[in-house]
Amino acid sequence: MDVGTIIGIIAAFLLILISILIGGSITAFINVPSIFIVVGGGMAAAMGAFPLKDFIRGVLAIKKAFLWKPPDLNDVIETIGEIASKVRKEGILALEGDIELYYQKDPLLGDMIRMLVDGIDINDIKATAEMALAQLDEKMSTEVAVWEKLADLFPAFGMIGTLIGLIQMLRNLNDPSALGPGMAVALITTLYGAILANAFAIPVANKLKKAKDMEVLVKTIYIEAIEKIQKGENPNVVKQEAAIMLGVELPEEV
């Protein structure tokens, strides 16, 4: 688990809360109708922008933002190097006993190793793996898009709520004493929208995008590495190319 997102979001809300408490009573910043407009309206509009199944999956993907663990890039490189070395020394069938281990490291890698051991043509293996990767990319991109849409809609509905409040306030211009409190209530929805977007939805969307980009990159490297390994390329070269793609500097002796 990468705790950065959890710490960041909690810290943002705490700092806002502390600032409110220092300036006065927190009750002045609580308005239930405003919450309904911003949260309910934003969620409803986002639901209308996606197929229901995609929207639900996207919202539930919030767990990934908090629980996703970045892959160990050095382990990815070492795994590729080990596979390449074993194939070069003992042949492809030597990988059969380690298929379950490769599945644990990455399901797509496990699938490719299994197909390789089964003697399936490398072009078919690559095509199947790329198709699976494209489906994963599309799925994770939709999850990111849901949260990016929420980040856009929360402030928009905050403004809608503010306009509603202003209209209601202007209907009571005959009572000047009510203008100040009315304006304050009207602006609360804008505040809610800004907070939810910038302190919550945007961080979640960015974390999901980071997870997607890293997952796609690692799996792409596995696909290219397996192709090179099957063609008998030098293990050190395969390993070095993977390290370059991942931005990892290998020891000079490798």
Curated annotation (Swiss-Prot):
Residues 205-254 are cytoplasmic. It comes from the Bacteria. Keywords: Cell membrane, Chemotaxis, Flagellar rotation, Hydrogen ion transport, Ion transport, Membrane, Transmembrane, Transmembrane helix, Transport. It is found in: Cell membrane. Its main location: membrane. InterPro entries: Flag_MotA_CS, MotA-like, MotA_ExbB_proton_chnl. The chain crosses the membrane at residues 6-26, 32-52, 150-170, 184-204. Belongs to the MotA family. MotA and MotB comprise the stator element of the flagellar motor complex. Required for rotation of the flagellar motor. Probable transmembrane proton channel. Each stator complex is composed of 4 MotA and 2 MotB subunits. 2 A subunits and 1 B subunit are thought to form a single ion channel, so that each stator complex contains two channels. This is Motility protein A.
